[in-house]
Structures are given as C-alpha cells and as structure tokens.
C-alpha cells in the first residue's frame, strides 16, 4: 500500500530573525518530522525552498520548507507538486492558526483560508483548496490590528511549550494521516 500523502509542507518565514516566531510553527513541525524520519533538508532553488526526501516503507514523502516568505508559499508548493506529479489531495500543509487556542490542533481537508495569506497563495497557485491542513493553534492577540506583530514575535515560554506539545502530538498522528486513516487521525488530534 502506498502513502496517501506524498508531500508535507511546513509554513514559515525564512531567516534567523523569524526562526522562533509563532508564524514558523509549521517549520518547527517539519524539522521534528525530518529528524524523526532521518531526512536532511537541502536548498533547492527550482523548488523555492528547502527540500528533503523521506524514503519510507510505503513510498517516498517529500518535505518542503518554502523560502519564499509566508505570503508566497504557493509558488514553492506548486513547483514541487508539478515536478513530482503530486495532486493537491496528496499534500499536507502544516501551519500556525490564530483562531485555535494555543496548543490545540485541528486537521481537515479543504476549507477557507481564514485570512491566512500563506493559505490564500497556496489555493491560488494550486487552483484548489482541496489539500490537507494540520493547524497548530497559537491563540489570537484579541485585536486584529495586533495580528501581524503577534505572529511575527516569539511566543511566551508557556505558549512555546504548548506549541511544542502540539507538534509532538501531531507527529504521533502522521502514520494514520499517511495511510489515509482520516477519522482516526482527526479523533486523536482533536482530543484534549
């Protein structure tokens, strides 16, 4: 049986100044997944990001950290997907989510972008919203005028611990996600 998911993308912004910011929660997840799978990232200019190939028993899975900045993530995803003939429904995008309490996780196929500029660009470049999303809650600052500063700053020690715990829990669901066991993955990820 082959993997249902062929590409896992972590969203974030490139550069040292952004490494520890909330908006890079997707990168944090992908770094942990690559470590778990013993996959190494290397910069691939034709894919506009850092790419790793995980050779798994049920087939290769590509890992991608776009280097295009969050708002242009779709460019990197579309380039890798087109080259390896990966369909949108075979892609899992992992990203931070303001509208979910810090440390909580949501998993779904498709849906709106919730104002997330990275998701807007992905939908525009793929031509569809029908890709899987693993949403890592980072909380909302309470005022929409504070959002940009909030996502581009480091979380508190407590919030970072909660996000790290969510990443660890999400990693446990990856085998079910890869196998297409959507209900099992959703039930596990949505539980407290």
From Swiss-Prot:
Binding site for tRNA: 18, 69, 71, 117
Residue intervals passing through the bilayer: none
Enzyme Commission code: 3.1.1.29
Active site: 23
Annotated site residues (Discriminates between blocked and unblocked aminoacyl-tRNA) in this chain: 13
Matches recorded under InterPro entries: Pept_tRNA_hydro, Pept_tRNA_hydro_CS, Pept_tRNA_hydro_sf
One of the record's GO cellular component terms: cytoplasm
Biological-process GO terms, alphabetical: protein quality control for misfolded or incompletely synthesized proteins; rescue of stalled ribosome
Key words of the record: Cytoplasm, Hydrolase, RNA-binding, tRNA-binding
Catalyses which reaction(s): an N-acyl-L-alpha-aminoacyl-tRNA + H2O = an N-acyl-L-amino acid + a tRNA + H(+)
Molecular function GO terms recorded: peptidyl-tRNA hydrolase activity; tRNA binding
Subcellular location: Cytoplasm
Group of enzyme by EC: hydrolase
Site (Stabilizes the basic form of H active site to accept a proton): 96
Cross-referenced HAMAP family: Pept_tRNA_hydro_bact
Record family assignment: Belongs to the PTH family.
Job of this protein: Hydrolyzes ribosome-free peptidyl-tRNAs (with 1 or more amino acids incorporated), which drop off the ribosome during protein synthesis, or as a result of ribosome stalling. Catalyzes the release of premature peptidyl moieties from peptidyl-tRNA molecules trapped in stalled 50S ribosomal subunits, and thus maintains levels of free tRNAs and 50S ribosomes.
Subunit structure: Monomer.
Protein name in UniProt: Peptidyl-tRNA hydrolase
Gene this protein is translated from: pth
């Amino acid at each position: 049986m082959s993997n249902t998911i062929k590409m896992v993308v972590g969203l974030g912004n490139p550069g040292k100044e952004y490494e520890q910011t909330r908006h890079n929660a997707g990168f944090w997840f992908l770094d942990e997944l690559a470590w778990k799978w013993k996959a190494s990232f290397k910069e691939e200019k034709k894919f506009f990001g850092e790419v790793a190939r995980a050779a798994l028993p049920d087939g290769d899975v590509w890992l991608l950290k776009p280097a295009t900045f969050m708002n242009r993530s779709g460019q990197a995803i579309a380039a890798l997907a087109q080259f390896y003939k990966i369909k949108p429904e075979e892609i899992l995008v992992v990203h931070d989510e303001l509208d979910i309490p810090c440390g909580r996780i949501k998993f779904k196929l498709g849906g709106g972008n919730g104002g997330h500029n990275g998701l807007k660009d992905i939908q525009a470049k793929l031509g569809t919203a029908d890709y899987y999303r693993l949403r890592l809650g980072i909380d909302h600052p309470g005022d929409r005028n504070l959002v940009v500063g909030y996502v581009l700053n480091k979380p508190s020690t407590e919030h970072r611990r909660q996000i790290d715990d969510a990443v660890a829990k999400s990693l446990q669901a990856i085998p079910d996600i890869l196998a297409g066991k959507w209900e099992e993955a959703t039930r596990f990820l949505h539980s407290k």
